[in-house]
Design a protein with these regions (language model features):
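Glycine-rich beta-strand-turn "strand-cap" elements at beta-sheet edges
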Residues: 5, 15-26, 64-71, 100-125
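Bacterial N-terminal signal peptides that target proteins for export
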Residues: 1-8
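Short glycine-/small-residue motifs
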Residues: 74
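An amphipathic, aromatic/His-enriched active-site/gating alpha helix that lines ligand/cofactor pockets
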Residues: 48, 52-62, 80-114
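N-terminal targeting signals for Sec/Tat export/insertion, comprising classic cleavable signal peptides
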Residues: 26-56
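Repetitive helical segments and hydrophobic/amphipathic motifs
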Residues: 11-12
Length: 125
């Protein structure tokens, strides 16, 4: 009986350790202001990059861009990655680098805000 209890305890401890070993998702808000004269070209470049990232990168879980209705040159992108490693792979991808290098002159300001989701287990449907 004692050996069985020790075995159960060890199994429970191992399970708890493995749960903590999983790498957490990375969630970020990118707050961007675009120069007004470049807005149509910027929107096209961003749409191309988002489509490519979502189609080609399994670690990119969401790139959801929204433009401010009252200030259409301001946008926020909700970025969700499976892990920090997935994010690091994303920013090295050819489609992201094409977007980044092609839009540098279009961007007036960029603020990257790492955030913690209230309910990280919820999925975007």
């Amino acid at each position: 009986m004692k050996n069985m209890l020790i075995g159960i305890f060890i199994s429970m401890a191992a399970c708890a350790f493995n749960v903590g070993a999983e790498e957490a998702q990375m969630t970020r808000l990118s707050k961007i202001t675009v120069h007004a004269d470049h807005l149509p070209a910027y929107r096209a470049a961003l749409a191309e990059e988002v489509r490519a990232s979502m189609a080609l990168e399994p670690g990119v879980l969401s790139l959801y861009a929204v433009f401010d209705k009252e200030e259409p040159t301001r946008l926020t992108i909700l970025e969700i990655y499976a892990s920090r490693q997935a994010y690091e792979q994303h920013v090295k991808s050819s489609h992201f680098l094409k977007y980044k290098n092609g839009t540098l002159h279009m961007v007036k300001s960029l603020e990257l805000v790492d955030v913690d989701p209230l309910l990280p287990e919820l999925k975007i449907k």
